[in-house]
Structure formats: structure tokens, C-alpha cells
Amino acid sequence: MSESADDLAEVKRRIAEAAKAAGRQPDDVTLVAVSKTHGPERVRELLEVGQRIFGENRVQEAQEKFPALKADYPDLELHLIGPLQTNKARDADALFDVNQSVDRERLAGVLAKEMERAGKRPACFIQVNTGEEEQKAGILPADLDAFVASCRDVHKLPVVGLMCIPPVDEEAALHFALLHKMAARNGLAKVSMGMSADYETAVRLGATHVRVGSALFGARH
């Protein structure tokens, strides 16, 4: 097997073990391969060994890499996992299949208008700033329930779940447990949490989506 195939198999094995340890089915967990800062040739290597779901942080970088890859692999699914500026909403709606970065009223309103205009409705995760960090995107936990209701009832967004990025200097498990609890409280079945350093913990605590980069691609360029 190629190095990409080996890395992918190892991550999937660890996801499966973590899922089974929690009494879950491995197929209940979606692996999002985070390809930010890596060129299209690295993405293609993973596509060739069966990976189909990828995550990108920046709209412009994704625009440079993924149209050609999507043409070659029509079943490729692309997730936006980085902060989204309102002036990039149209481009994001056109390219991404899932938006994991919905985090404020103004953005929700712009996305709703764009979805209506284009007739394309990417599934939405609401990003929660569980650590309440000033420098980080995400709705604050105290404001989440009202924002979920607004996204559903006012903006009519296809909200399917929640996403978080825990503070690097805090125990990730506490944030994963909080996100899972908030998702359940709002009737949301999907939770995107866990990265290369902690995705097994996230799976044990109920993650339906894990965002893994360095364990698949190596260090960022």
C-alpha cells in the first residue's frame, strides 16, 4: 500500500476502535480529511485510495484546488471548516457541500438569501465557541439555543449539527461533552469535533464527524 493508504487505514482503524469502545458503530463516524495548505496532488492521493470527504479552511484556497478534483470525482464532498466572511458567502455556497462555520446572525441571513438565489442548500453546522475565546469564531454557548431557533425558523437554513474547536490549553473532553449536550438539547443529530490529536476522545464522546489533517497529510506546508 502507498503511504496515503497506510495513513488512511490507520486513522480509520483508530476511529473504529474508539467507536466500538463507546458502544457505537464505526460507520456512525464520518472522517473529514483536512487538506488545508496541501496541494491538489496530496488530495488526489487520498481520493485514489477511497477517501471522499475533505475539509478546507479558506474559500479562496478551496477554489484553487477543488473544481478540477470534483470534476474527476463527482462524489467528492467538500466541507468548509474555517471562518466565513459574508462577502465570501456566494462563493462558499457554490463550492462547498457542507458549511461547518455558521456562527452569527448576519452570516445566517446572507447564506439564506444566497441559497434562495442559487437554489443550492449546503447542510449547515453551527460553530460554537465553547471556550469563549475572544480570538476564535463561533457563537457563545449562552446564545446558542436562540441562534439555532433563528437559523431554523427565521432564516430557514438546513441546520444539521454543531461544531467546535476547543482551546488548545484545556481538556478537550470537557468541550466535546458540552457540545454533545447542546446538540442533543436542540435536537441536532450531528456533532463535528475532534482533530488529529484528540479525535479518538471525540468519538468516544459522541462525535459524528472528526476533522483530521496532520495524521493523514503530515505537517502543514
Locate the predicted segments by residue.
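Gly/Pro- and small hydrophobic-enriched strand-loop and loop-to-helix capping segments
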Residues: 207-221
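Conserved alpha/beta-domain cores
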Residues: 1-190, 195-197, 203-205, 219-220
